[in-house]
């Protein structure tokens, strides 16, 4: 086995272990933020939505800068620094009793993510061969789902005692992850050339096809982020207990572990990437519309199942398509910019979703936010169809397995 092949094989295992630690650290804390501050402390949902939206926008919106710096200086220092910064954000969140302190903790957490997320994504593109990326992204997403359940279960159990224990556990996991990277991650370059920060950013911004694709995905993310805000609140409201939230993530894990990899393997040779992405988005949009009209957990969990199935169809195609469009000379910059759609869509989804949720309650129209999200999903579906029409998009970009 050549040294390059050996590095790729070892790199796969490193990426999987690293991803599990990051997912556990994140999901111990973040699914419980809305429960803690809205249900336990009585804050307005929009106040928590601002905090979650700020974290999302800082982490993803500034990702191009984190990616460009990583292109210049390498992945390791950025990843280690970012993970320690996120640990500091979680520690601060544990003592937050005013909105400004929660916002500051989410700002720190998001800034840490800005530093470590783009280089971690670029490492996947660097180490995994193009024909294997779709399946590897599916494995990562299966791991994300399992980690989300374990993290949410652990966080829910700790929340019975003290929210500070929840935040301390998340902080410790990110400190462990930083030490793991500092010890084992080689000083790999992310790009084929040592791209100056400004040059990497220029390459991305001049790629109109990539920029359009990323911005179009903002509508997709407005729906996707509700698993952190409105869906947990809805489950808690109907069940009357935050303990029920863990079953929402258990559903996601079961569906992902049983369906994600088989669907990805089956569809990658039969359907174009944009068709898989659009099909998943359509299922997600349809499942959102009736949520505000349900009256029991069985109905709600059925719709959540449909939502997760849509995500299972869409996510591997979205990640694979983003990676396939990245310029090898500026991988970090491209993968950083690819998060901008999540920054915009996530921020609007959190803040707008929280505002609409409060508005729906005030007007006794609980279906209002869910109807609006469904409409946004349909508009995004049409926009993607227009962008990826045969007349506008080179065929080789969208081939099955590309």
From Swiss-Prot:
Residues 34-98, 160-164, 235-243, 298-299, 361-367 are periplasmic. The chain crosses the membrane at residues 13-33, 99-116, 139-159, 165-185, 214-234, 244-264, 277-297, 300-320, 340-360, 368-388. PANTHER family: MULTIDRUG RESISTANCE PROTEIN MDTH, RESISTANCE PROTEIN MDTM, PUTATIVE-RELATED-RELATED. Pfam families: MFS_1. It is found in: Cell inner membrane. InterPro entries: MFS (IPR011701), MFS_dom (IPR020846), MFS_trans_sf (IPR036259), MFS_Transporters (IPR050171), Multidrug-R_MdtH (IPR022855). GO terms for cellular component: plasma membrane. GO terms for molecular function: transmembrane transporter activity. This is Multidrug resistance protein MdtH. The keyword Transport applies. It comes from Salmonella paratyphi B (strain ATCC BAA-1250 / SPB7). The keyword Signal does not apply. Its main location: membrane. Residues 1-12, 117-138, 186-213, 265-276, 321-339, 389-402 are cytoplasmic. It is a multi-pass membrane protein. Belongs to the major facilitator superfamily. DHA1 family. MdtH (TC 2.A.1.2.21) subfamily. Keywords: Cell inner membrane, Cell membrane, Membrane, Transmembrane, Transmembrane helix, Transport. It comes from the Bacteria.
């Amino acid at each position: 086995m050549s040294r390059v092949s050996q590095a790729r094989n070892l790199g796969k295992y490193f990426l999987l272990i690293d991803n599990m630690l990051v997912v556990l650290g994140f999901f111990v804390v973040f699914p419980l933020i809305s429960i803690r501050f809205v249900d336990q402390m009585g804050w307005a949902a929009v106040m928590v939505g601002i905090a979650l939206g700020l974290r999302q926008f800082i982490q993803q919106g500034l990702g191009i800068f984190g990616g460009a710096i990583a292109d210049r200086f390498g992945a390791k220092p950025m990843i280690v620094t970012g993970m320690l910064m996120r640990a500091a954000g979680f520690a601060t969140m544990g003592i937050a009793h005013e909105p400004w302190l929660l916002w500051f903790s989410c700002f720190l957490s998001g800034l840490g993510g800005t530093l470590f997320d783009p280089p971690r994504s670029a490492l996947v593109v660097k180490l995994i061969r193009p024909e294997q990326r779709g399946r590897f992204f599916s494995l990562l997403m299966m791991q994300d789902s399992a980690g989300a359940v374990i993290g949410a279960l652990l966080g829910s159990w700790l929340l019975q005692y003290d929210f500070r224990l929840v935040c301390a556990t998340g902080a410790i996991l990110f400190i462990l992850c930083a030490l793991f990277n500092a010890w084992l991650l080689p000083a790999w370059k992310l790009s084929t050339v040592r791209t100056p920060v400004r040059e990497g950013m220029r390459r991305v911004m001049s790629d109109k096809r990539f920029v359009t694709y990323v911005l179009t995905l903002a509508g997709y993310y407005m729906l996707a982020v509700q698993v952190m805000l409105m869906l947990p609140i809805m489950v808690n409201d109907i069940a009357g207990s935050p303990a029920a939230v863990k079953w929402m993530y258990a559903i996601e894990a079961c569906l992902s572990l049983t369906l994600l990899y088989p669907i990805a393997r089956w569809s990658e040779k039969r359907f174009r990437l944009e068709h898989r992405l659009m099909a998943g988005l359509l299922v997600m949009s349809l499942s959102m519309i009736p949520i505000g009209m349900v009256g029991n957990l069985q109905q709600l969990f059925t719709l959540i199942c449909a939502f997760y199935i849509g995500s299972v169809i869409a996510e591997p195609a979205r990640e694979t398509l983003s990676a396939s469009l990245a310029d090898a000379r500026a991988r970090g910059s491209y993968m950083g910019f690819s998060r901008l759609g999540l920054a915009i869509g996530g921020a609007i989804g959190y803040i707008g979703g929280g505002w609409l949720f409060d508005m729906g309650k005030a007007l006794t129209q609980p279906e209002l936010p869910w109807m609006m999200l469904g409409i946004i999903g349909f508009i995004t579906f049409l926009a993607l169809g227009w962008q990826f029409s045969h007349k506008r998009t080179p065929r080789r970009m969208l081939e099955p397995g590309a």
